[in-house]
Amino acid sequence: DVYKRQDGIAEERRFYYGAQVSRGNIFKYPANVFVEGEETSLFYGLETDGIYQTGDVLPDVFGSTAVPGDVKIVDQNGDGIIDLNDRTFIGNPNPDFIYGFNFNINYKRFNASILFNGVFGNDIANGNLLQLNNAEGLTYLNISPDAYYNAWRPGNAGEIIYNEYPRIGYTTNGQPAMTDRIIEDGSY
């Protein structure tokens, strides 16, 4: 497979695909990859850049033309078509630091122990956001209020609208790869 580095240079490297992330339906391609010379299990999917607005140029996205209110996926290779060739690294589940602290105290027949541990600098893929942040319609009623009330809606002519959430009815069902919209900081 071809791997595109951060500086934009494409290299031929061995890819090994990892595990799936889903909400009952499974993406056609795994969420993480193992790339020779890189850290293990990097999240591999589609980078997004907001929501398509009325008046935007709408590309083909996996064989269908995007509509206003859809999630805007970055065309990584610049060919004007959104497909699997536009996947890139979208997160790193490997922590920069792992830390811990253990404290024990004993006095006669009383003892107490406190343990703190955590990680810093890693990403997680929060599969709950696949449903909670998309108002897909009547079949998916368990969405966040923010995703519903701040979903994309058409504006008046000339009105500039910035929406964090896609239109009501936008679906991630059948999407072949996950997007960076479900990647979060996993530090604790």
Short names for language-model regions:
Residues 1-188:
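Outer/extracellular conduits and scaffolds centered on Gram-negative outer-membrane beta-barrels
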